[in-house]
């Protein structure tokens, strides 16, 4: 039942996404000076608590910035940073970062096998769907549906977000609650395994 709810929710969200107006990456680059302190000059952060956003799907980046600005997503470290930017400017920023190249990372070999199994096949006994169903086998996500790129993301950040969805602290995954449903029965060890696998997935 949970798997059916998951896939129906994904279909609804994908069909509901609107097409955003044309964005200007060069104009976006000019607005990113304040972003570089945490996310690096090209969207590759140097600290695992700050997400890599280089190469991230444009529509996902835009949605997250809009959610943070409207406080639909809690992000205390970004409080006020987006307040004076309009939607077109946020679209331009998203376009710029989506065009940047994501740096590669190395993985914890002790966790990779379990992480790969969960990512590609899910956990049947817990009715947890495969992450790859929405985020693609290579972790590239789904741009039109605003499902994020996961490959190459810092494990610390991925762990923090999965735990936030699991606890309900983060809840901007839409009415379908796909991420909250998926993460609710994941153990800390399983979350860490998936995060480690994703960091080295390219």
Question: Which ranges hold each PLM region?
Answer:
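Positively charged n-region of N-terminal signal peptides that target proteins for export
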Residues: 1-5
């Amino acid at each position: 039942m949970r798997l059916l709810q998951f896939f129906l929710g994904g279909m609804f969200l994908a069909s509901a996404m609107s097409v955003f107006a044309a964005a200007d990456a060069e104009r976006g680059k000019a607005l990113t000076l304040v972003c570089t302190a945490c996310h690096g000059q090209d969207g590759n952060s140097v600290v695992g608590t700050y997400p890599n956003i280089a190469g991230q799907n444009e529509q996902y980046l835009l949605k997250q910035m809009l959610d943070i600005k409207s406080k639909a997503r809690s992000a205390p470290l970004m409080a006020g940073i987006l307040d004076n930017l309009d939607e077109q400017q946020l679209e331009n920023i998203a376009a710029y970062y989506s065009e940047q190249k994501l740096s590669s990372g190395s993985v914890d070999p002790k966790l990779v096998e379990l992480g790969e199994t969960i990512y590609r096949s899910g956990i049947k006994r817990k009715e947890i769907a495969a992450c790859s169903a929405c985020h693609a086998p290579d972790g590239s996500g789904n741009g039109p549906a605003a499902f994020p790129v996961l490959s190459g993301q810092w494990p610390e950040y991925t762990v923090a977000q999965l735990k936030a969805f699991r606890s309900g602290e983060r809840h901007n995954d839409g009415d379908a609650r796909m991420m909250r449903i998926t993460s609710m029965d994941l153990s800390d060890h399983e979350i860490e395994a998936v995060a480690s696998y994703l960091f080295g997935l390219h």
